[in-house]
């Protein structure tokens, strides 16, 4: 199965990028569409899917909770608030990526401060994140009430999670984030696996639990942040990708397979969104939300039947 996943990614990516050639038309126009529209869109889908898959795997491993993911605990919402603030308030003064990073890291800091006060981790992190997520989403809605209707529409599409009109700058954002933060997580993989045995056992085996936890959370947060910058706050993918990977391999915290599963899910969702009748313009985030909700419902039904 591990050898099949890269092949699936290549097939989906090849088909996704070659769409204009299947539709016929002028060859020069097709070349332009391929280089400036479909190829960047495909590369962003691969990168954002991989980043979200990795981020979800880390959050679920650290919280020891299947609901741990950057969209549920407020990281994506914080990144959205930061990106919108930069694009609407501090126009041309800061890159959108910088605003998104500040927003996401502020949310992470608030969650960690809450956990420090309560002195607990795990489920408490999920609850704290959900509360902060609700507050961040309220800020987003408040921001939308003060902008022009055209801007509000564009922001709403982006907030749904969209791969439309992706550029090479978006490819650069996600393409630079994955090698840096992905390799950082890869370097922490062994201590993270040891920490699954329990913090006390990990400390006995020489793992600095607090340092590994903090670095892993920062790397996972920044991966999710750059996915949001590149493709908008796509929901459920970071939650579902680690579950599917575990179902396939029966092993926890497989970073590379989880990244590929995330890419496959986002590429598939984008192809499904584009397969709808022209003019429907369904954001890919709507598709991932629907598929993710169905998947979780199936899991709940199976658990209930047991």
Predicted regions and their residues:
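Alpha-helical transmembrane segments in inner-membrane proteins
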Residues: 1-306
